Amino acid sequence: MNPYFLNDATPWTELGDGIRRKIVGHTPELMSVLVQFDQGAIGTPHAHDAHDQIAMVISGSFACDVGGVKRVLRAGDAFVAPRLTPHGVVALEAGSTLLDQFSPRREDYL
């Protein structure tokens, strides 16, 4: 396994609807993923059965809803969504980017 992530050498994977991601790195217990959104793109509300998630805003801003609590988050802010907690986002600016951390790793992303 390569222990380094080189952003410029890693292409985005287009997910559709104005959302793209890059896998930064992973172990069986942890995964880091950059997720970039076009303005107005929606991270549809959902919950994870088997994963805890921390999402940190790297750039831009998001309207977030975690467990029914709504906030606008900007670069440097984050939210925690323990497993089974509904959460979703709407990008308020073009290029808004999250660094998602999952535990354990998301096998469905590999």
Q: Where do the model's predicted regions map?
A:
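Ligand-binding loop in jelly-roll beta-barrel domains
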Residues: 83-108
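Structural motif
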Residues: 61-63, 70, 86, 95
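Glycine- and acidic-residue-biased ligand/ion/polar-headgroup-sensing regions
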Residues: 50-62, 67
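A short, N-terminal "cap"/entry segment at the start of jelly-roll beta-barrel domains
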Residues: 1-31
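Conserved short histidine dyad/triad with adjacent acidic residue
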Residues: 33-48
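Short acidic-glycine-tyrosine-enriched beta hairpin
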Residues: 69-83
